[in-house]
Amino acid sequence: MAVNLVTGVTAKHGTVVDFGAGPGLFLHALGEARPDVTLLGYDAYMEPTYPEVKYVASMEGIAAGSVDVLTAFEVCEHLYADELDALLDDALRILRPNGALVISVPIMCGLAIVPKVSNWMIRSRSLKSEYTPTEVLKAMVGMRVSRPENPRTTHKGFDFRQLREVVEGRFSIDATHMSPMPNMPWWLSSQYFMICRPKRNSASNSAVCA
């Protein structure tokens, strides 16, 4: 789904930057689907493993108004509030006026919480979970669960609806998609995608935001 969504919003010979690119698997797959696209990755912790993918040392090194699509797949749930603000500021600065910010995050409420918590317990070979039984029930019915102070290694308590509210402060959300149940209510899926466009006033004021 990520490759299809980005392919659909990327202009011919466009530039795509993947924030939190890891070893570059997504950009590699995108390059196979769209050989015309320039691929740039940024990751504070990992090096690229695919020779066709170039990494930038920092987001500040990307020229203003030079990017067609900025992606942030499965990373926003691990950012502190100030880091998320910095990412959105960078997006407004580097995106072209008609560019797109494409985000995906896990859905940690609704029915998906049960298999996700169960899977975590199986993988860790433990009967203990970050979630108490009460918190699992709260998450199942869409109630918010408190987040740990450190979001780096956990999804607990992440609420995509709160992220959407923050993003909507600076971007217009053109489209949303759910996986693996795209035509069903969000509480039946486990992943949430947003295609976001800079608001006109935000784009013009990006220098102030940065």
Where do the protein language model's features map onto the residues?
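Conserved class I S-adenosyl-L-methionine
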Residues: 13-22
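Residues at the starts of beta-strands that form the adenosine-phosphate
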Residues: 15, 38, 100
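Local beta-strand N-terminus motif with an aromatic residue
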Residues: 13, 67-68
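Conserved alpha-helix/loop element of class I SAM-dependent methyltransferases that forms part
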Residues: 1-13
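Class I SAM-dependent methyltransferase SAM/SAH-binding core
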Residues: 22-60
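S-adenosyl-L-methionine-dependent methyltransferase catalytic module, highlighting the catalytic core
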Residues: 25, 29, 60, 80-96, ...
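A conserved beta-strand element that flanks and buttresses the S-adenosyl-L-methionine
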Residues: 71
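Short catalytic micro-motifs in class I SAM-dependent methyltransferases
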Residues: 74-78
